[in-house]
Curated annotation (Swiss-Prot):
It comes from Nostoc sp. (strain PCC 7120 / SAG 25.82 / UTEX 2576). Confers stability, involved in shaping gas vesicles, hollow, gas filled proteinaceous nanostructures. During planktonic growth they allow positioning of the organism at a favorable depth for light or nutrient acquisition. Sequence repeats lie at residues 19-51, 52-84, 85-117. GO terms for biological process: gas vesicle organization. It is found in: Gas vesicle. Keywords: Gas vesicle, Repeat. This is Gas vesicle protein C. The gene is gvpC. GO terms for cellular component: gas vesicle.
Length: 129
């Protein structure tokens, strides 16, 4: 019976040692996994931070370039419209001056024609003066 008790104690110790060993291995595995995951998370956080900084830099450069282009385009458009407006005003003034001159000449010609017509009409009706 004592041999059986000794054997039971040995098996109990063996089981306890196996449980302790399994606990240690599980703890080591979980510690290693936690450390690995923390390192991965740290790397991902660094990569994400770098990506965010690059994105902000790229966005800033893009917006700066776009703003510069749009300002240059607006200035060119303003210059074009200013020149167009000046040309339009000059052309309008020239047209109005030419039209006024032509109408004045036409009015003078009509006036002379009507005076001559009137003289001729009086001459034909009343005879020569």
């Amino acid at each position: 019976m004592t041999a059986l008790m000794v054997r039971i104690r040995q098996e109990h110790r063996s089981i306890a040692e196996e449980v302790t060993q399994l606990f240690r291995e599980t703890h080591e595995f979980l510690s290693a996994t936690t450390a690995h995951r923390q390192e991965q998370a740290k790397q991902q956080a660094q990569q994400l931070h770098q990506f965010h900084q690059n994105l902000e830099q790229t966005t800033h450069e893009f917006l700066t370039e776009t703003t510069t282009q749009r300002v240059a385009q607006a200035e060119a458009q303003a210059n074009f419209l200013h020149k167009f407006h000046q040309n339009l005003e000059q052309t309008t003034q020239e047209f109005l001056a030419e039209t006024a001159k032509n109408r004045t000449e036409q009015a003078k010609a009509q006036s002379q024609y009507l005076q001559q017509f009137r003289k001729d009409l009086f001459a034909s009706i009343f005879g020569t003066f």
